[in-house]
Amino acid sequence: SLHLLFAADEDIATCADQGLMLRHTVQFHWQNTAPVAPVMSSEATSEWLAMPNRFTSFDDFLASLTQEKRKKIKQERRRVADAGVTFRCLQGKAISTGDWDFFYRCYERTYLEHGNPPYLTRTFFEDMARTMPEAWVLFIAERDGQPIASSLIAISACPASATGQKDTEIIAYGRYWGALERVDCLHFEACYYQPLQWCIEH
């Protein structure tokens, strides 16, 4: 089968002309941009105006959410912490062969639990670790000193000129994940909150 992602408009038209099926999906993009101070509002205090245009911590991000969403995220994170789960974050060449092996065990198990073979092979990840190690950030969940789950994101540097920012931007893409143990809310922590926190810090 053939799958094309992020194809140019002319390529999409060519594919359609050749009888390929087109599938439209929705994507969610998050940017580390703190809310702009309200204009014409008493809320536009000196604190608002002094805020950086980026979140500087996960708490800053939480403060930008509604009370209900903030409460839900805090509860989910607390459930994971109360279960005794901590995280290690590894990037680039700091990810050892053993770490990659553990990640793949988790990744493979998740696919097998859903009755599918994994799309990507261990050799694929070996090649990626060898040829572009700087492009990966691995989050390993541990309990009692033993790894129990992991998630992986790809990153790339984007020149400032392409984003309109002053500095080079780091862009994180998607995630792969898997777990050897079930812990309530672990998926959210490993796949969303840990990567989001990493993005804010970097």
Where are these regions (language model features)?
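Hydrophobic pocket-lining residues that define ligand/cofactor binding sites across diverse proteins
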Residues: S1, C199
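Conserved acetyl-CoA-binding loop-helix of GNAT-fold acetyltransferases
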Residues: V183-Q197
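A conserved beta-strand-loop-helix scaffold within acyl/acetyltransferase catalytic domains
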Residues: L2-C185
